[in-house]
Curated annotation (Swiss-Prot):
Statement: the UniProt record of this protein carries the keyword Lipid metabolism: yes
CDD domains the record matches: CYP1A (cd20676)
Protein family according to the UniProt entry: Belongs to the cytochrome P450 family.
GO molecular function ontology, one term from the record: steroid 17-alpha-monooxygenase activity
The organism of origin for this protein: Cavia porcellus (Guinea pig)
Glycan attachment residues as annotated in the record: 63
Protein name: Cytochrome P450 1A1
Length: 516
């Protein structure tokens, strides 16, 4: 046999072998269903180059071509990407049990030593019980009323204190340098709110321990948002990685801080005198009961995981929302003035805004909804996974498949919004001036279904109250001639480049009679 014939035979054999291996490992698609469509990908790396620096934009473009259910590969891992409000609601709400899982990603095992409630792949009874416990504790020390305070609830009391501090601080900075970076101060105030709820403790704005913790959280968002190749290319786990080393270290330090706070709470814990979320969780841990039949227990390690999840998520998301809000206010003075006119008319200046004022401030609510939509600062949910073989829109999705949910695409879908690239709060107002609830509920930023963010209600309330108190007293602008870079920086939460050129002037007092 000639050499060329041998080479041809060898090539054909290898091709057949590869084809056989692919067929063996490819899930068998049930009759009547199809595999999700998607673009051609490179060997070994799949579509990693296609995603680039802004995966939300790349996947939005792909969804326009391939539809609301498409499949890509990241490394050797198949990933199904969901877009479109109806499709995502179908998956996460109507078929919520099928899509409530978390992928067992390598990097997730280092968050809370694998005990994180948010990132852990468990989606069974223990996870559900932990989630109910966390939800109950969060409600008890945020939206529940505080009998010792004139505020309507614990959250309102904490936010008012921090907002008052911010007003004073911004005024001091204007009297000094004459400009400032609001993020530097907002993040500490928001962190203090969740710290008071979780630990019953407020920190100084110069406290090095808290500032270090904030830096760790920012790093976490950057590293997690940029993706970890070893999650999808297993062989990389055994090779040196500076990014992975950083990720492990910041999670270790974050856990050490939370463990320290919990140990201090154990030392001073008094049954019947529950001071904060940590005390509430310790009480449940000592009772060893999570359900009415006492079948599910919670360990000390899982307490750390719950507190870490609540604390970490409790200030990054809200700080980012407030930061984008301030940016859009200085870029749109007309909108800022309209919000302040509404505040003056409804509340006046004799008292601070309260949570009870929300229904009477529709333009403020419309503005916040537009901030959430336009910025889409959480472009994706944390990845989901399927808990069983299922189908969606006629496409077969096997058990354990990693699912990306593109929230950015929903919030910029021209079919939903008409002019998604225009910042226009009025879109959320009905002709009679009230909030169009049906439309505002289409804004997707906190996820949907069984994995929906636990703190969504608290987050919305907190953003509203901070902004209302600040805008009642201050008018925000930027230094003359300064241009702000509004380009979002991709991450777990998308932020804009820090800017030192914000200004705030105390609003002149104009006596107006508030509405009855």
């Amino acid at each position: 046999m000639s050499t060329s014939a041998m080479e041809l035979l060898l090539t054909a054999t290898i091709f057949c072998l590869v084809l056989w291996v692919v067929r063996i490992f490819r899930p068998q698609v049930p009759k009547g269903l199809k595999s999700p469509p998607g673009p051609w990908g490179w060997p070994l790396i799949g579509h990693m180059l296609t995603l680039g620096k802004n995966p939300h934009l790349a996947l939005t473009r792909l969804s326009a071509r391939y539809g609301d259910v498409l499949q890509i590969r990241i490394g050797s891992t198949p990933v199904v990407v969901l877009s479109g409000l109806d499709t995502i609601r179908q998956a996460l709400v109507r078929q919520g049990d099928d899509f409530k899982g978390r992928p067992d990603l390598y990097s997730f095992t280092f968050i809370s030593d694998g005990q994180s409630m948010t990132f852990n792949p468990d989606s069974g009874p223990v996870w559900a019980a932990r989630r109910r416990l966390a939800q109950s504790a969060l409600k008890s020390f945020s939206v529940a009323s505080d009998p010792a305070s004139v505020s309507s609830c614990y959250l309102e009391e904490h936010v008012k204190k921090e907002a008052e501090y911010l007003i004073k601080k911004f005024q001091e900075l204007m009297a000094g340098p004459g400009h400032f970076d609001p993020y530097r101060y907002v993040v500490v105030s928001v962190a203090n709110v969740i710290s008071a709820i979780c630990f019953g403790q407020r920190y100084s704005h110069d406290d090095q321990q808290l500032l270090e913790l904030i830096d760790l959280n920012n790093e976490f968002g950057e590293v997690t948002g940029s993706g970890n190749p070893s999650d999808f290319i297993p062989i990389l786990r055994y090779l040196p990685s500076a990014t992975m080393d950083t990720f492990k270290d910041l999670n270790r330090r974050f856990s050490v801080f939370i463990q320290k706070m919990i140990k201090e709470h154990y030392k001073t814990f008094e049954k019947g005198h529950i001071r904060d979320i940590t005390d509430s969780l310790i009480e449940h841990c000592q009772d060893r009961k999570l359900d009415k039949n006492a079948n599910i227990q919670i360990s000390d390690q899982k307490i750390i995981g719950i507190v870490l999840d609540l604390f970490g998520a409790g200030f990054d998301t809200i700080t980012t929302a407030i930061s984008w809000s301030l940016l859009y206010l200085v870029m749109n003075p007309r909108i800022q003035k309209k919000i302040q006119e509404e505040l003056d008319t409804v509340i006046g200046r004799e008292r601070q805004p309260q949570l009870a004022d929300r229904p009477k401030l529709p333009y403020m609510e419309a503005f916040i909804s537009e901030v959430f939509r336009y910025s889409s600062f959480m472009p994706f949910t944390i990845p989901h996974s399927t808990t069983k073989d299922t189908s969606l829109n006629g496409f077969y999705i096997p058990k354990g498949c990693c699912i990306f949910v593109n929230q950015w695409q929903i919030n910029h879908d021209q079919k939903l919004w008409g002019d998604p690239s225009v910042f226009r709060p009025e879109r959320f107002l009905s002709p009679d001036g009230t909030v169009d609830k049906a439309l505002s509920e289409k804004v997707t930023i906190f996820g949907l279904g069984k994995r929906r963010c636990l703190g969504e209600v608290i987050g919305r309330w907190e953003v509203f109250l901070f902004l209302a108190i600040l805008l009642q007293q201050l008018e925000f602008s930027t230094s003359p001639g300064v241009k702000i870079d509004m380009t979002p920086i991709y991450g777990l939460t998308m932020k804009y480049s820090r800017c030192e050129h914000f200004q705030a002037q105390t609003r002149p007092f104009v006596l107006k009679c508030p509405e009855a």
